[in-house]
Every structure is written in C-alpha cells, then in structure tokens.
C-alpha cells in the first residue's frame, strides 16, 4: 500500500507546517500581556479544525458515495487534535507527551485497521439507508465531529494547561486502563476480522476468542481506554475543567445506547435470531463486560440487567 504511506507522509508534513504557521500567526496577533486571541483551553481552535476536517471528508464521501474515508476521518481527527494542542502550547510536559502518544497510538492503529477492513469489504453497510439521503448522511458526519471534539476534551485540556504536578497514582491507573482497553480493542478487532475472512465461518456470528466472553469486546476496550485517558488527566484539572468528564461519558453513552451496541445487536438479531444456538449464545455471553460463559449464563436476570447492562434495548429485534 505505497499510496497510503505516501498519503500519511504528506499529511504529516502538511500538518506540521500548518501548525507551525498557525502558531506563528497566533503569537503575532496576541493581545497585550501575551494572552492568545484564542481561548486558553484551545476549545475554539479544536472545534474549528474538527469541523473543517470532517467537512472536507464529508464532501468526498457524499460527492463520490465513497465509504472508505469515513472511519479513517474520525480516527485520524483525534490524532490531529492531540498533536495540534501539544504543538500550539509547546510546553511538552511528560504527562502531555504520554497522553498525546497514547491517543496517537490508538488513533493510528484504529484508522489503519478500519481502512484495511473497508478496502476488503468494499462498502459500509451502516450507510445503506443514508447514501441517497443527504440530510441523514450529513447528520452522521455532524455526530462524528461532535464525538471527536467531545471525547478529545481531556487531552485538549491537559495539553493546553500550564499546570504540571508530579506523576500521581491517577496517572498510573489511567495509563494501565488505557493499555488494557487498547489491547482488548486491538485483539478483538483482529479476532473478528480473521473470523469473518475464514470461508468456513460464512453465515456465522463471531464467538471466537474474546467474543466468547463478551458480545462486544472492542467496545468494552474503547470505553475502558477513554476512561483511562480521563483518569490520567485528572491531576491537571481544576474548577470548570472537570467538565471534560463529558468525554468518556459521551463515548460510553454513544456505544451503549445509540450507534454502538444497539445497532449491532439489532442487525445480528435480524440475521441470526431464528437460530437456537445464537439465542443460547446471547443468554450465556455478557453484552459488554468480559465474563466466562459459565458464570454469566447462571447469573440471575436482575444482575444481568442492572449490573451488567443486559438491556431490553439489546433484544428489541429478537422475535419469539
């Protein structure tokens, strides 16, 4: 994939040059006393960059009905915001470097994986009912822009801060949670891709590896890693900055109640709901938190529902 390497090198060069030029302009247009014309937390510039970045890819996707750039645009946007805020503030404290690197590793890994997958599959079925409806398609991209900006808030605030307290337990806990979450997501993605690419598994749902312990291990990993990022950011937060908890709450809510688990459960129920073995799989397999099937399958229904999030929403398309 030589074209991809060239694209990434070009993107990196353009972004570095652009950010350097932007910082020069901002410094030259500062108010008296050295205060930037932008807000101290870089909320405006990250919002502007996110909107412009997503809009540019939306034009490609909508104009060419081209699904291959959608997830790539979302994942790489996180990396751009983390690097942008780090370069603009230019303090490079250890905590800032670590969080920027963690977001970069996650974003690049996910972007390349999703790009490789969509190149194999050819199209994204999520957009089957949206490609011909510009308003629906635009709504998806608007939500994606809000998702990127909101979930990036903890790293944005850390990179914009002059506070640099010593490394604390919260940092270590956050980094560990990120590592466990990122590893879980990466392993789950590879296991499912390998399962789907095996002709022997055609017409089957994935229950291999981590997918035998939870129906959505990739989402469990993603939720865990973003809560880890938030926890690692807490030593820097003060006052109203604690509102950045909206980031992990937002990604958790989206995956649990909106475009994550509900959509995939409905799709799987529609496709496999008539199979007794699939119903047994759902009964014995946790929707999110990994647990041995022998444990989860024997838990009382109230424990599954109230503690492990086996919500009625996840069975709405399962007919009797």
Which residue stretches match the model-derived regions?
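Select subsegments of transmembrane alpha-helices in polytopic membrane proteins
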Residues: 72, 135-148, 215-222
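Short, hydrophobic transmembrane alpha-helix segments
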Residues: 32-38, 58-68, 87-91
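Juxtamembrane helix-capping/reentrant segments at transmembrane boundaries
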Residues: 66-79, 122-140, 204-211
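Hydrophobic transmembrane alpha-helices
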Residues: 2-23, 40-54, 77-107, 151-191, ...
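Interfacial transmembrane-helix boundary/kink motif in multi-pass membrane proteins
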Residues: 98-101, 125-143, 167-172
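C-terminal ends of transmembrane helices
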Residues: 55-66, 112-118
């Amino acid at each position: 994939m030589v074209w991809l390497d060239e694209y990434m090198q070009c993107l990196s060069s353009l972004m570095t040059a652009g950010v350097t030029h932007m910082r020069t302009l901002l410094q030259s247009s500062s108010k008296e006393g050295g205060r930037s014309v932008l807000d101290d937390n870089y909320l405006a510039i990250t919002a502007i960059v996110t909107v412009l970045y997503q809009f540019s890819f939306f034009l490609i996707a909508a104009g060419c009905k081209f699904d291959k750039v959608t997830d790539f645009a979302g994942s790489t946007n996180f990396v751009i915001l983390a690097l942008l805020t780090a370069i603009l503030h230019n303090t490079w404290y250890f905590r800032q470097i670590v969080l920027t690197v963690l977001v970069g590793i996650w974003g690049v890994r996910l972007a390349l994986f999703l790009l490789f997958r969509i190149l194999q599959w050819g199209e994204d079925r999520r957009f089957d009912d949206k490609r011909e409806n510009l308003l629906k398609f635009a709504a998806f991209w608007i939500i994606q822009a809000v998702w990127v900006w909101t979930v990036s808030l903890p790293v944005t605030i850390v990179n914009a801060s002059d506070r640099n307290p010593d490394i604390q337990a919260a940092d270590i806990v956050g980094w560990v949670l990120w590592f466990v979450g990122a590893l879980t997501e990466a392993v789950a993605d590879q296991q499912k891709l390998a399962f789907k690419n095996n002709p022997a598994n055609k017409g089957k749902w994935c229950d291999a590896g981590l997918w035998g312990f939870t129906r959505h291990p990739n989402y469990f990993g993603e939720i865990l890693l973003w809560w880890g990022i938030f926890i690692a950011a807490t030593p820097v937060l003060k006052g109203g900055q604690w509102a950045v908890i909206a980031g992990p709450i937002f990604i958790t809510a989206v995956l649990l109640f909106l475009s994550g688990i509900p959509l995939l459960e409905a799709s799987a129920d529609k496709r496999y709901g008539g199979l007794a073995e699939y119903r047994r799989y759902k009964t014995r397999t946790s929707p999110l938190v990994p647990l041995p099937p022998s444990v989860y399958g024997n838990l009382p229904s109230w424990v599954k529902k109230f503690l492990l999030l086996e919500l009625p929403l996840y069975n709405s398309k399962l007919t009797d």
